[in-house]
Regions:
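Basic/polar N-terminal segments that are highly enriched at the extreme N-terminus
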Residues: 1-9, 132
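Residue-level signal for tight coil/turn positions that link beta-strands
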Residues: 78-80, 112
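Short beta-strand edge/turn micro-motifs at domain boundaries
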Residues: 101-132
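Short, cysteine-centered beta-strand-loop-beta hairpins and adjacent loop/turn segments enriched
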Residues: 62, 90-99
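Hydrophobic/aromatic beta-strand elements that line small-molecule binding cavities or substrate pockets
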Residues: 56, 69-75, 87-89, 103-109
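A solvent-exposed, acidic/Ser-Thr-rich amphipathic alpha-helical stretch
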Residues: 7-8, 12-14, 20, 27-77
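Generic short beta-strand segments
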Residues: 37, 85-91
Length: 132
């Protein structure tokens, strides 16, 4: 696979675009960062941009309107960049004063000249140490 950027650079750039879209515009702008046939796996499974936009709009409507994303790991596998991230969302409205922590994975695929998420999983919850 030919990449002008390293997997880490691609992942950090994607996370920054996701943060900007979510923090500025919410669900519609964020859904555009997914491939047309992408799948989002969270509390429910959403397939395609329209369903993903609806799922994200529900989260946004609950007050989780600001997010910060930290890329933990990124690697190229085949034509994809696999990304592991941690996120913190801050609430407003019904969730004012609360912070939601979680982890997510993205399988990023190059669509035309843009890296988009082909599959995204998100798990809410505080960090859990690994058993030794």
């Amino acid at each position: 696979m030919h990449m002008e950027q390293t997997p880490q650079e691609i992942a950090v750039d994607y996370a920054a675009r996701w943060e900007r879209a979510w923090n500025s515009h919410g669900a519609l702008a964020t859904a555009q960062l997914y491939a047309p046939d992408s799948v989002l796996v969270g509390a429910a499974i959403a397939a395609g941009r329209r369903e993903i936009e609806r799922a994200l709009a529900f989260i946004f409507s609950q007050g989780w309107q600001r997010i910060s994303i930290k890329v933990v790991n990124a690697r190229a596998v085949g034509g994809l960049v696999l990304v592991v991230s941690e996120f913190s969302a801050t609430g407003s409205g019904p969730t004012a004063g609360k912070i939601l922590h979680g982890k997510s994975t993205h399988a990023l695929a190059r669509v035309d000249d843009t890296w988009l998420s082909a599959m995204h999983t998100a798990i809410n919850g505080a960090p859990t140490p690994l058993a030794t």
